[in-house]
């Protein structure tokens, strides 16, 4: 059933979708940015029924206020805000946080808009009209792939050229001591490369490793993640020396990698 969602269709979706509530599922906080009052109310009602805490705001000022005073697990942003560009909210949040960002849009549906949103750090892009039950499923997917706030028990560090990726702290550091922020997808993708240096990895393998949805517009999501990683790692992203393309086969990481297991180095 496709909905935008209307009140009638929404009520039907609630009745049919009540089995989507997972036993013992912790209460997660969804922050919605949408200046459509009716849409805000419908999403709040539906997600609340399915064991989510939802805060809905109409603009970036209210968004920033909530974000600074509460723990947020996933952000949903409508691109088509009347007074501002939703992409700016995405850009600003992705630059300083790994909170998953889901974009919803009814007008800006060109491939360029979707690719730009992904490049800026969005986790998902949903076109209106959409299925409210699919919307719920996408939120759950975004929450599953978010890195844990608690530090990982994996104590490995990967050293390559003048970079170090620390798994316990989930940090990418340069030899000079500067930290480069990575989104969850970028982190997972880089780790996949570092665990198998110089092995050609197919796009399907990389999709699984990075936990990116492989459907519709997301067929290009690996290319987008590769581009973003190259921009962060390579001196000249247009002539990459680390992440290289194997034509017709996938990508490979062309560098020596040393692995430290809590102090012990291994090649």
UniProtKB/Swiss-Prot annotation:
Record key words, sorted: Activator, Crown gall tumor, Cytoplasm, DNA-binding, Phosphoprotein, Plasmid, Transcription, Transcription regulation, Two-component regulatory system
Positions bearing 4-aspartylphosphate: 78
Domain Response regulatory per the UniProt entry, residue ranges: 29-143
Annotated region of DNA binding: 155-255
GO molecular function, one term: transcription cis-regulatory region binding
Localisation: Cytoplasm
Domain of life: Bacteria
Free-text function comment from the UniProt entry: VirG is required for the positive regulation of at least two vir loci encoded by the Ti plasmid of A.tumefaciens.
UniProt-recorded name of the protein: Regulatory protein VirG
């Amino acid at each position: 059933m496709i909905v935008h969602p209307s009140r009638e269709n929404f009520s039907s979706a609630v009745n049919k979708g009540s089995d989507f509530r997972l036993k013992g599922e912790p209460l997660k906080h969804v922050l919605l940015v949408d200046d459509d009052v009716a849409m805000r109310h419908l999403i709040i009602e539906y997600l609340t029924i399915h064991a989510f805490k939802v805060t809905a705001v109409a603009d970036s000022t209210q968004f920033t206020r909530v974000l600074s005073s509460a723990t947020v697990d996933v952000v949903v942003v409508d691109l088509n805000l009347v007074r501002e560009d939703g992409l700016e909210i995405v850009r600003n949040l992705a630059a300083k946080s790994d909170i998953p960002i889901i974009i919803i849009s009814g007008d800006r549906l060109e491939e360029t808009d979707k690719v730009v949103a992904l490049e800026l750090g969005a986790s998902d892009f949903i076109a209106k009209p959409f299925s409210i039950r699919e919307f719920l499923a996408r939120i759950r997917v975004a929450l599953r792939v978010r890195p844990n706030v608690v530090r990982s028990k994996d104590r490995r560090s990967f050293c390559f050229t003048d970079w170090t990726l620390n798994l316990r702290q989930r940090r990418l550091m340069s030899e000079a001591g500067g930290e480069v922020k990575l989104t969850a997808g970028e982190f997972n993708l880089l780790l996949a490369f570092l665990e198998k240096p110089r092995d050609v990895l197919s796009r399907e393998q990389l999709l699984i490793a990075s936990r990116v949805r492989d459907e519709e517009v997301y067929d290009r999501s690996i290319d987008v993640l590769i581009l973003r990683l190259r921009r962060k790692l390579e001196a000249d992203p247009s002539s990459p020396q680390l992440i290289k393309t194997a034509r017709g086969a996938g990508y490979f990481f062309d560098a020596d990698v040393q692995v430290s297991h809590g102090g012990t180095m291994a090649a």
